[in-house]
């Protein structure tokens, strides 16, 4: 019996919607990352993008434990000397709430072209409205 290897053109991708309201950031991010990779499917193949599309709504209402709301920092560097910029979680959740979930999930995906392709299937929205009603997403309870 030969080992099954999924082909990119034969992979069936579904659309799922996740409500992040009141959910813990890390717990929701791990499940989203696993779904984006396709690890929940029987035809999972490590070098093929077999994951589904994930829509996350209410990103502004995500929850963190402990003192992370004030103490957690996000860093970015411009590439120039002294070009590091830091922003705390509470300021980032006010300014760009989508970025909080995107950063958490992106760190859990593979680095490289395959990981970037998986990350493109993640759609995050700050409020309850999203632009993917035509795809008829199924509710994913995490």
UniProtKB/Swiss-Prot annotation:
**GO BP terms, alphabetized:** negative regulation of translation; translation
Q: Report keywords, A-Z.
A: Ribonucleoprotein, Ribosomal protein
Main function: This protein is one of the early assembly proteins of the 50S ribosomal subunit, although it is not seen to bind rRNA by itself. It is important during the early stages of 50S assembly.
Output the superkingdom of the source species: Bacteria
Q: What is this protein called?
A: Large ribosomal subunit protein uL13
From which organism does this entry originate? Aeromonas hydrophila subsp. hydrophila (strain ATCC 7966 / DSM 30187 / BCRC 13018 / CCUG 14551 / JCM 1027 / KCTC 2358 / NCIMB 9240 / NCTC 8049)
Quaternary structure and partners? Part of the 50S ribosomal subunit.
HAMAP family in the cross-refs:
Ribosomal_uL13
């Amino acid at each position: 019996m030969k080992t099954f290897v999924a082909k990119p053109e034969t992979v069936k991708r579904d659309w799922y919607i996740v409500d992040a309201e009141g959910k813990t950031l890390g717990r929701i991010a791990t499940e989203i990352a696993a779904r984006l990779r396709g690890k929940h499917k029987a035809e999972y193949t490590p070098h093929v993008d077999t994951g589904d599309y994930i829509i996350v709504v209410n990103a502004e209402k995500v929850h963190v434990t402990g003192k992370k709301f004030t103490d957690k920092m996000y860093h970015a560097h411009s590439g120039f000397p002294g070009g590091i910029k830091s922003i705390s979680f509470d300021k980032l959740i006010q300014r760009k709430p989508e970025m909080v979930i995107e950063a958490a999930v992106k760190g859990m995906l593979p680095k490289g072209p395959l990981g970037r392709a998986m990350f493109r299937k993640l759609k995050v929205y700050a409020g309850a409205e999203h632009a993917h009603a035509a795809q008829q997403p199924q509710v994913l309870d995490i």
